[in-house]
Design a protein with these regions (language model features):
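Cell-envelope/extracellular polymer assembly enzymes that use nucleotide-activated donors
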Residues: 5-7, 36, 183
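Short, well-formed alpha-helical segments that are part of the catalytic scaffolds
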Residues: 15-30
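Donor nucleotide-sugar binding loop of glycosyltransferases
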Residues: 15-18, 44, 69, 95
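Conserved donor nucleotide-binding strand/loop of the catalytic core
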Residues: 35-38, 49-79
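A conserved acidic beta->alpha catalytic loop
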Residues: 41-49, 92
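Acceptor/aglycone-binding surface of glycosyltransferases and processive sugar-polymer synthases
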Residues: 63-79, 84, 96-178, 205-221, ...
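Catalytic donor-sugar/metal-binding loop of nucleotide-sugar-dependent glycosyltransferases
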Residues: 149-150, 172-176, 185-203
Length: 243
């Protein structure tokens, strides 16, 4: 890979039926760009890893057990070789044509570029179910209260990082589940990284492999753990070293 490569990390769980199409769509969305696609199979137990390899993913990382989206994204980030890293959902709820906007923000000086469904210029093709949308808003309010953060949308599945920022953040993350996004943003604040929010277009696809209530309970508990770890100094050396 050339130094200017864009690394796209796809955490995948039981995604054998969609991963090949996803890999192809990401490549076609950035013609002329050197793109590294990393699929992290989060202990799917099906043929997700084989389908990703056959589709031409540059790296396929297979976790031996289902550890969670946070663990999968971390594994991809720590194995990526590009100068800009992006993670997105394998079901492409955010069309890959939106990735260049994140890269533009990073090249304009941001360390972290956050897709935000709450951005005034964001829109929806297909909305999330009402229960999930309400739950998302409550979770964001809870997160802002517990961590004293200012982010309106922590859980958007489209985020970009410079290589230095990604390394600084993901070598310190501890959360393996869906609340990892909150930990990522908390660490970005603690590391004094420059963040910017980018509008997105959401085309929601319901994830039948996600059990909403148990996951929501775990996410709330993980946010409390992030607060505790931060207060107890469990995150090491919060100093950004730029390459």
């Amino acid at each position: 890979m050339r130094p200017a490569a864009i690394s796209v990390i796809l955490p995948a769980y039981r995604a054998s039926s969609v991963v090949a199409t996803t890999v192809a769509r990401i490549r076609s969305a950035m013609p002329g760009k050197e793109v590294e696609i990393i699929v992290v199979d989060d202990g799917s137990g099906d043929d997700t890893d084989l389908a990703a390899s056959r589709a031409g993913a540059d790296q396929v990382i297979k976790l031996q057990e289902n550890r969670g989206k946070g663990a999968a994204v971390r594994a991809g980030m720590l194995n990526a070789v590009g100068s800009h890293f992006v993670f997105t959902d394998v079901d492409l709820a955010y069309d890959p044509s939106q990735i260049p906007a994140l890269i533009d923000a990073l090249e304009s000086g941001a360390d972290v570029a956050l897709g935000s469904r709450r951005h005034p210029h964001s829109s929806e093709i297909t909305s999330a179910p009402a229960l999930r949308e309400r739950g998302s808003r409550i979770f964001n309010q809870f997160t802002r209260l517990v961590l004293r953060s200012s982010y309106l949308d922590t859980q958007c599945g489209l985020k970009g990082f410079t290589a230095d920022a990604a390394h600084a953040i993901f070598t310190r993350t501890k959360v393996d589940g869906f609340a990892f996004d909150v930990e990522v943003l908390h660490l970005a604040e603690k590391l004094s990284l420059k963040t910017t929010e980018v509008p997105v277009i959401l085309d929601h696809i319901e994830q039948t492999t996600v059990r909403f209530i148990p996951q929501a309970t775990r996410m709330l508990w993980d946010v409390l753990k992030i607060r505790m770890w931060s207060a107890l100094g469990r995150y090491p050396d919060l100093t950004l070293r730029r390459g």
